[in-house]
Amino acid sequence: MEVMTLERTLTELDHVRLLNLLRRDTRGDGFLAQRRAMEDMLDTATLVPSREVAGDVVTMYSQVLLKDLQTGQQQTLTLSYPADAQPAGGFVSVLSPVGCALLGLTVGSVARWSTPKGEEMAAEILAIHFQPESSGDYAM
């Protein structure tokens, strides 16, 4: 899995939680590329306190409106931790290819990722409908 290198901003809390999540990750070798992409993103992201993150940044549990650049179809997704992921309900795991591609990007950015089947995907972030930090929830 390849994730385009883009400027990423993460809250310090999300960063710590994701590092801990990766330490406990017991998935097999089939997820090595995905794991490396997440580790690279965590290593290079700009970290900010939760109270200082801009409202246009995709953080954990942000609900985002995406536009598929191939089909033009719009879709709303919520970025979640694996235990809360329900893809059919629009909750995608941060450890999924699309979840990793979205985290830390801003409205107007294009997220690019490869599906497990090798299909290249791209979607523009049109809006953030909900971001916990903008609502005063700094511990979600």
Regions found by a protein language model. Give the residues of each.
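Residue-level marker of positions within ordered structural domains that often coincide
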Residues: 23, 69, 130
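Long amphipathic N-terminal alpha/beta scaffold segment
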Residues: 36-81
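A broad, low-specificity signal marking well-ordered, structured residues that form hydrophobic/aromatic
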Residues: 16, 77, 123
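Non-DNA-binding regulatory cores of transcription-related proteins
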Residues: 61-63, 70-120
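Conserved NTP-handling cores and scaffolds of large molecular machines
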Residues: 45-46, 106, 132
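N-terminal intrinsically disordered, low-complexity, charge/repeat-rich segments that act as generic
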Residues: 1-55
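Acidic/glycine-rich phosphate/pyrophosphate-binding loops and surrounding catalytic core
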Residues: 6, 122-124
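Short peripheral tails and domain-boundary helices/loops at the edges of structured domains
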Residues: 126-140
